[in-house]
Amino acid sequence: GTSSMVLYTAGSSTSYPSHAPNGIRLHFLGGAREVGNVGCIIEDRSGTRVLIDYGLAPTKPPKYPSEAPPVKHAIMTHAHIDHIGMAPWLTHHGTTLHGTDLTAAVSEIMWADTYKVSDIEGYPLAWDKRDLEAALDSWVPHQFNTWFNVGEWRCRLHPAGHIPGAAMIEIQTPEATILWSGDIDTRNSPNAPKATPVECDILCLEGTYGGRTHPDRAEEEERFVSRVL
């Protein structure tokens, strides 16, 4: 249930498998069959383990992901609350947060707002202000197209479109190259360059608008301006 998220102690009630994977394992904590509430553990037989995103769905009441196992590293694709909303809780594990500098900067605003809204609406939150401060201190920002190491893996971030600072994550493991798309937009916008293909062996792709055709951006901008004026 939703309340169990608030009561659990770090690492004590996670459903994450205790045995080492035979190959590459993707274990979803949320977001696999839903929009938002995202979190996925990727681990291989080397023992390297990383958490991709850790959000909450800002519904009433909020919907929380399953409890994360201890992780040394988490990579945040972008600063929307359904992708980073639970990240301050990870400070119980001493987790290092990776992302773009813009995602790190915007996270402070998003977390402060989440804390304020939960207080106003009276919904319990699994982290407090001390966790928020610790999470801000745990960021390690990265530039696009710059390699960094996570355990035995090499990782780098690529522009994802969507919102400023949003990133796709390329992960080179000894067995395969994984691309985690995060939320993407394949069209340029005034605020963010579009996502472009990255060669990989395993593609983890979001499908929020997979079955929908978006209206033409120029027409939408004209319609917006005419409404305002």
Regions found by a protein language model. Give the residues of each.
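His/Asp/Glu-rich metal-coordinating catalytic cores
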Residues: L7-G11, Y16-E34, G39-I75, H80-I84, ...
